[in-house]
Amino acid sequence: MSASLLQFVVLLGVMAALVVPVGNWLYGVATGQKDTALERLTYRVIGINPRERMDWKRYGLAIVVSNLVMLLLAYLLIRLQGALPWNPAGLAAQSPDLAWNTVVSFMTNTNWQAYSGEQSLSYFSQMAVITTFMFTSAATGFAAALAFMRGLAGRDGTNLGNFWVDVTRLIYRVLLPVCFGLALVFVWQGMPQTLGAYANATTLEGAAQRIALGPVASLESIKHVGTNGGGFFSMNAAHPFENPTPLTNALHILSMLLLPSALTYVFGRMLGNLKQGWVIFGGMLVMFVGFLGTVYSFEQAGNPILSKLGAEQAITATQAGGNMEGKEVRFGIAQTSLFATTTTAATTGSVDSMHDSYTGMGGFVPMLQMMLNNVFGGKGVGFINFVQYLVLGVFIAGLMVGRTPEFLGKKIEAKEVKLTMLAVLAHPLSILGFTALACVLPGALNSLNNPGPHGFSEILYAYTSGTANNGSAFAGLSANTFFYNLTIGLSMLMGRYLTLLPMLAVAGMLAAKRRVPAGSGTLPTDTALFGALTVFVILIVGALTFLPALTLGPVADHLQMLRGVVLK
């Protein structure tokens, strides 16, 4: 137990220690006026004016148009895979519905995979489509967050920045250098990085085996730095080529948390009020630690059904103990629990264990984190989701004292509240709506491999993961069907754009408003009390919205397990 807690403290301590230096670096990237020679060349090639100012409408339009163009190009490349180079295994193109699901998944930073990477995509597709989207989707979300911050901090609604400049700088100055250095470390730790043919080997039993290789290290670095999550191999970070050592596992966890946590400090610097950034960071960290403790407790306690059968599940010198089904022995319960909590908090979606094999309440937490979708979150969208609850918290507090609510010196009026509620409600509408549809269609139910509450949990998890742009899965659901490829693809689009665009509009509207001086009735938003109020609002809204569905799924699954019922 003490060793497990030490791992948590060390990794979270390193993350917290890096918030300020990384935040200062990102702030410099976001506010710098000088362009590098490579950036100026890029602007000339794509024909943009880097000094152009964009309001929220133009910024949002640039996001949508650029994403649509990339979507169409990526779909074409996936469908023509069989005729393109760097395909040593001779893999055929994906079906139209699977190709749709794949390109939408990686364009929205979801990285949901209804396919096995090493058996479905060529080296060219992995690099030209998958890895490229990992950079552009991360930069897009990050850029949207910076524009959102400028709107909240600014006094000019016509200047939320320039989308093309933000994306270019983030890729050149942040993502590429960090990922290049990290990829070198991964190669040193044993990850493959090759364009050569698959390796052929003979097993101990004398059977022939073909071992998939490829440019793994380069994909793995941006996979976690960009909170993408899609794996080169079907086993994702549980595969020894994607995650060969405990050091790479720790680096994966840190990579996922590094930039999202630092964004809170960037926000504080943009506002000129560091306390506001620390309040957001503190609220996220409190929820993260609570969720981590819950996952670890239930997984370390083990499976009561096995305990009744006499299985030894206690921690000893020779075993990690607990519920080790679906987990890597080399990582144990502690690192696995931390990875699962991190990947669903940071909307990454990569896994070093099978979430479908967790206990009922162990699987409850990853699902709930994606439903809330604001505990650190991914590159930008998670931060925006947290701030939308800050706006709600201010609005609720204003109603309680009978005053017009104010946030950062700007009055929160009906338009802002309506757009915020659109962003808040789009999330459960997608998750619960598509889950309900799948539960009443016999064809959709045929994809289940488990009956009862656990089967329902698999469907609920799939649409939660898609809408939250996470990408992890309860893998017992056979999702490569026309229905799931189509509907999960739609849920990804709803989760991405019906959150991002309305909140970008809120930022633009607030930027155009005149600041009002703080009065006796102004609620300060940079205090621990307001941070606690925001966390309370997040948990209450999440509980009221999703608790009925969670009760039918993972909670009922856990209660059945306590009764000794395996599947029913």
From Swiss-Prot:
Pfam families: KdpA. GO terms for biological process: potassium ion transmembrane transport. Keywords: Cell membrane, Ion transport, Membrane, Plasmid, Potassium, Potassium transport, Transmembrane, Transmembrane helix, Transport. Signal peptide: none annotated. It is found in: Cell membrane. The chain crosses the membrane at residues 8-28, 60-80, 129-149, 170-190, 247-267, 278-298, 381-401, 421-441, 471-491, 492-512, 528-548. Its main location: membrane. GO terms for molecular function: P-type potassium transmembrane transporter activity; potassium ion binding. InterPro entries: KdpA. It is a multi-pass membrane protein. One of its GO terms (cellular component) is plasma membrane. It comes from the Bacteria. The keyword Cell membrane applies. The system is composed of three essential subunits: KdpA, KdpB and KdpC. Belongs to the KdpA family. PANTHER family: POTASSIUM-TRANSPORTING ATPASE A CHAIN, POTASSIUM-TRANSPORTING ATPASE POTASSIUM-BINDING SUBUNIT. Part of the high-affinity ATP-driven potassium transport (or Kdp) system, which catalyzes the hydrolysis of ATP coupled with the electrogenic transport of potassium into the cytoplasm. This subunit binds the extracellular potassium ions and delivers the ions to the membrane domain of KdpB through an intramembrane tunnel. NCBIfam families: kdpA. HAMAP family: KdpA. This is Potassium-transporting ATPase potassium-binding subunit. It comes from Deinococcus radiodurans (strain ATCC 13939 / DSM 20539 / JCM 16871 / CCUG 27074 / LMG 4051 / NBRC 15346 / NCIMB 9279 / VKM B-1422 / R1).
